[in-house]
Curated annotation (Swiss-Prot):
Involved in the biosynthesis of the chorismate, which leads to the biosynthesis of aromatic amino acids. Catalyzes the reversible NADPH linked reduction of 3-dehydroshikimate (DHSA) to yield shikimate (SA). GO terms for biological process: amino acid biosynthetic process; aromatic amino acid family biosynthetic process; chorismate biosynthetic process; shikimate metabolic process. It catalyses: shikimate + NADP(+) = 3-dehydroshikimate + NADPH + H(+). This is Shikimate dehydrogenase (NADP(+)).
């Protein structure tokens, strides 16, 4: 795969750190596949540099940006506008220009539901682990689908309570999470992500073995099987990792930026192969 030497349009991802991101591979592959004269780069931006970066990006030929941890909420007041779905989610993961206005959107809700809808089963109760930008998108998706029995928990109890009040769901202390009855458990935390946190998990394995099997959904896609998912699968639970969500939300970003559709199956295979090879 080659990147154009002089791209007509520049895109990128901002977050900190960014070592695990597959977004440059996905979007540059899409540009090449569809003959787009554009390029996508990684921009590691520390939290204290976010406002300065956004200011600089406005003056540079940057046509759009992906936004990841820890900037999904912090970036919102720095924008000219946000879309209704980003407003509903309370977080932004996509920046684009709309009539000259730097606008924030959220494709995580779409991405989260894409594989969940494919499962074809309804769930009675959900436990959402974490209270960051991804958790906002998950709660927006679940409540939009009419799911009433939803519980959120986070190490920072204040953040969880604010999130629970925003979406009208239940909140429990992090120390009480193992007592929650749920047949859908979603990990939105970075616990288990490749790197220093790979050996960590947000739930004790006993959680899964002590209740009827349901669905464990980890938004992490690298590694493909976290300790969280391995524990659930060992107890007979169905599992989903974050690969399909990642590809779906990225394809939706591509559509927003370029007005064209990425072939989902090919994009998924690209990322899966890259992860398997350790790229």
């Amino acid at each position: 795969m080659t990147i154009p030497r002089i791209p007509r349009q520049l895109y990128g991802i901002i977050g900190y750190p960014l070592g695990h991101s597959m977004s440059p591979l996905l979007h540059n592959w899409g540009f090449e596949l569809l003959g787009e004269q554009a390029a996508y780069m990684a921009f590691p931006v520390a939290p204290e540099k976010l406002a300065e970066f956004i200011c600089c990006a406005r003056m540079l030929p940057v046509s759009g940006l992906s936004v990841t941890i820890p900037h999904k909420q912090a970036v919102m007041p720095l924008l000219d506008a946000v879309t209704p779905r980003a407003q509903a989610a309370g977080a932004v993961n996509t920046l684009f220009y709309d009539d000259g206005k730097l606008t924030g959107d959220n494709t995580d809700v779409y991405g989260f539901l894409h594989p969940l809808d494919s499962c074809g089963t309804a769930h009675a109760a959900a436990l959402v682990l974490g209270a960051g930008g991804a958790a906002n998108a998950v709660l927006a998706a679940l409540t939009a689908r009419g799911m009433c029995n939803v519980t959120v928990t986070n190490r920072n109890g204040d953040r969880a309570r604010i999130l629970a009040e925003r979406f009208g769901v239940r909140c429990v202390a992090w120390e009480e999470r193992h007592a929650v009855d749920a047949d859908l458990v979603v990990n939105t935390t970075p616990l288990g992500m490749a790197g220093d946190r790979q050996a960590q998990t947000p739930l004790d394995p006993a959680f899964f073995s002590s209740r009827p099997a349901g669905l464990a959904y980890d938004l992490i896609y690298n590694p493909a099987q976290t300790f969280f998912l391995a524990s659930a699968q060992a107890a007979g639970w169905r599992v989903l990792n974050g690969l399909d969500m990642f590809v779906a939300q990225g394809a939706e970003q591509f559509r927003i930026w370029r007005g064209r559709e990425l072939p989902f199956a090919q994009a998924r295979a690209l990322i899966a192969d890259a992860l398997a090879s350790g790229c």
